[in-house]
């Protein structure tokens, strides 16, 4: 192999190594970002504001959204984590205390409320009779407000979950 070809190969390898290290650094930072934040005791004000905006925008479409969970303490999170493991019930979370966006006031869970007042988690329900799933209409609104939907996750689907990191 001549010198220019060797130089090109070495530069390509260095570029790929830099790319790999950048990715690893980004992933490490993302996973540890919550640990660096001070622990709040309520929803972040922007998350609360956007949760209220979500409810209002959904109501304008004839959909009644109920926020079933917001801020959750580390202790409450650990109790949920025990469910299906050391306590009776189904597993409802894979996050221990300190690992959930709920613990930092950055996540909400929602459900739909029918006209009779019952709370449902039915992703196919079309209470406003427009031919679309009310659940997915709410998700669409949430995404425009900056929320990430747990239903888009690859590993564990958490359909009622919405989270955000305010700018």
Swiss-Prot record:
It comes from the Bacteria. Optimum pH is 6.5. Residues 1-26 form the signal peptide. It is found in: Cell membrane. GO terms for molecular function: peptidase activity. One of its GO terms (cellular component) is plasma membrane. Keywords: Cell membrane, Cell wall biogenesis/degradation, Hydrolase, Membrane, Signal. Its main location: membrane. Its EC number is 3.4.-.-. GO terms for biological process: cell wall organization. Optimum temperature is 37 degrees Celsius. Cleaves the linkage of the L-alanine-D-glutamic acid of B.subtilis cell wall. Belongs to the peptidase M15C family. This is Peptidoglycan L-alanyl-D-glutamate endopeptidase CwlK. It comes from Bacillus subtilis (strain 168). The lineage of its organism: Bacteria, Bacillati, Bacillota, Bacilli, Bacillales.
């Amino acid at each position: 192999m001549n010198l220019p070809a060797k130089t090109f190969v070495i530069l390509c390898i260095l570029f790929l190594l830099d790319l790999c290290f950048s990715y690893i650094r980004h992933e490490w930072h993302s996973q540890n970002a919550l640990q660096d934040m001070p622990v709040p005791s309520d929803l972040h004000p922007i998350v609360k504001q956007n949760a209220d905006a979500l409810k209002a925008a959904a109501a304008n479409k004839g959909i009644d959204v109920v926020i079933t969970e917001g801020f959750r303490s580390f202790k409450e999170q650990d109790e949920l984590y025990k469910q299906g493991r050391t306590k009776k019930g189904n597993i409802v979370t894979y996050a221990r205390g300190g690992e959930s966006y709920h613990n930092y006031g950055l996540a909400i869970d929602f459900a739909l409320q029918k006209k009779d007042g019952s709370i449902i988690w039915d992703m196919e329900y079309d209470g406003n009779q427009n031919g679309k799933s009310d659940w997915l209409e709410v998700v669409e609104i949430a995404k425009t407000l900056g929320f990430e939907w747990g239903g888009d996750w690859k590993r564990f689907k958490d359909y009622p979950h919405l989270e955000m990191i305010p700018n």
